[in-house]
Regions:
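Short, solvent-exposed secondary-structure capping/transition elements
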Residues: 23, 27, 96-100, 168, ...
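Short, extreme N-terminal leader segments that mark the start of a protein/domain
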Residues: 1-24
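Short, charged/polar micro-motifs that form catalytic or ligand-binding hotspots
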Residues: 1-5, 93, 142-145
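N-terminal interaction modules that seed assembly of large macromolecular complexes
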Residues: 16, 20-75
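Broad gene-expression machinery/nucleic-acid interaction feature
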Residues: 42-46, 57-59, 82-88, 135-137
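Short, internal acidic amphipathic alpha-helical interface segments
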Residues: 66-130
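Glycine-rich, aromatic-bearing surface loops/beta-hairpins
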Residues: 104-173
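Short amphipathic alpha-helical segments
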Residues: 2, 6-10, 99-103, 151, ...
């Protein structure tokens, strides 16, 4: 009998919750991927979305490595299987120095101090850098498991709230 892994159970719950938000008209799903990396024997699920009338995006990334998958399937003693969770927000900025300070305040207000939050700026060579892409990674420092399934709806509400707060900073046309 097939017994789904923690990764598979979390993926199904995330996917269902995100598509429910899409169906209700709160967001629009713009991309989805479910990958198996044969070189590292890992799995990654990602779903990207934006507000219905927005341009900023949020991407939920759920991943599990070989040790997590094997530890769970082979029932290794002392194994602590689970999944890594990251949420990545992306937007285009003008005047990044001032905007990033404000965005950092917004992110800390919404997400507290629990996850690590890193903003990475990039721009095309030859442009002056006044307009750049900001990728904000919210990374949780511990693995998640089936015990956190009830928290998924609230986590997605946080992503929608974050998108609303970031949208005024987005200058992408």
């Amino acid at each position: 009998m097939f017994d789904p892994t923690i990764y598979e159970n979390l993926k199904v719950v995330f996917e269902g919750a995100v598509y429910d938000l899409d169906l209700d008209g709160h967001i629009v799903v713009t991309h989805r991927s479910d990958l198996i990396d044969l070189a590292t024997m890992s799995r990654t699920y990602a779903v990207r979305y934006r507000l219905k009338d927005g341009r900023c995006t949020a991407e939920v990334r759920l991943s599990a490595g070989l040790v997590d998958l094997a530890g769970e399937k082979l029932e290794w003693r002392n194994a602590l299987p689970g999944c890594k969770l990251e949420i990545v927000f992306a937007l285009t900025l003008r005047n990044p120095e001032a905007a990033c300070r404000n965005i950092d305040d917004i992110m800390r207000q919404v997400w507290d101090a629990n996850p690590s939050i890193v903003q990475t700026l990039s721009y095309r060579y030859g442009e002056d850098g006044a307009c750049c892409r900001n990728e904000i990674v919210v990374a949780f420092d511990r693995k998640i498991g089936e015990g956190q399934i009830d928290d998924i709806a609230e986590l997605l509400e946080h992503t929608v709230r974050t998108l609303r707060l970031l949208e005024p900073y987005n200058t992408e046309e």
